[in-house]
């Protein structure tokens, strides 16, 4: 299976290859999976005070704000003071309600960028996203489902891996998809790699809650907003991914 890999905000191809190297080595050891790494189409500067956290330049994003002003801010700035409400959906609404700049224009261009890349570098069997990359991956999956309904185009992706994810945008890019206010569901098998110590855990769970509960699986590496690197944990995760792949192959076999 060939996976398209999307890094988090301020990531790059080279950085994401390093972050994901243990899992890549595990899954490529028996040729279960091959990986195609990309980066966001927008080159950006990291937030002030976070330069060391994201490593050296260059920095890329998939989503950028279009109207930052005195009254609005990038959602990345908002999550520095991440709220914790009763449910993941309540938390995400609180996060996005006040003064967050719009990102629909950049997200629309990013979808065009991804579809062009899929045509040139694909086909791909699965998609893998970390943090902001998971948001865009989920958005792309829902957009593929909408195109199938409206235009009869079959989706390319058959499964997804989400690391430290956030809920997707609607296919029309006018807001987030939250399970307590939308019937939209990501209908391919998904594996959600979360850390129970992640300060943004509610973002992870809000994404999980808009996936098909019959084919969505949570894998907890028990750390923070990071990718698992411990050898035993990576081996266990590799086996989980292989199980998802076998289920997908069984579903799509002749």
Residues of each region from the PLM?
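Acidic catalytic loop of the alpha/beta-hydrolase fold
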Residues: 168-170, 195-202, 224-226
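Short beta-strand/loop motif that positions the catalytic acidic residue
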Residues: 185-186, 191-194
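Gly/Ala-rich beta-loop-alpha elbow adjacent to hydrolase catalytic centers
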Residues: 128-137
């Amino acid at each position: 299976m060939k996976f398209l890999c999307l890094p988090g905000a301020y990531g790059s191809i080279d950085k994401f290859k390093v972050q994901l190297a243990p899992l890549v080595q595990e899954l490529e050891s028996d040729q279960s999976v091959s990986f195609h790494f990309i980066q966001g189409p927008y080159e950006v500067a990291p937030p002030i005070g976070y330069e060391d956290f994201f490593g050296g330049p260059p920095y890329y994003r998939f989503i950028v704000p279009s109207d930052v002003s005195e009254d609005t801010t990038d959602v990345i700035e908002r999550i520095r003071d991440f709220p914790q409400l009763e449910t993941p959906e309540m938390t995400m609404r609180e996060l996005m309600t006040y003064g967050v700049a719009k990102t629909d224009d950049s997200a629309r261009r990013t979808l065009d960028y991804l579809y062009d890349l899929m045509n040139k570098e694909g086909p791909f069997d699965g998609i893998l996203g970390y943090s902001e990359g998971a948001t865009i991956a989920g958005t792309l999956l829902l957009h593929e489902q909408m195109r199938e309904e409206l235009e009869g185009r079959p989706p390319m992706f058959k499964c997804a891996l989400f690391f430290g994810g956030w809920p997707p945008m609607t296919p029309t890019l006018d807001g987030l998809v939250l399970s307590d206010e939308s019937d939209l569901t990501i209908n391919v098998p998904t594996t959600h790699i979360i850390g129970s110590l992640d300060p943004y855990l509610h973002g992870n769970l809000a994404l999980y809650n808009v996936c098909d509960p019959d084919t969505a699986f949570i894998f907890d590496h028990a750390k923070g907003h990071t990718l698992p690197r411990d050898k035993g944990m990576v081996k266990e995760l590799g086996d989980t991914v292989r199980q998802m792949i076998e289920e997908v192959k069984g579903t799509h076999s002749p």
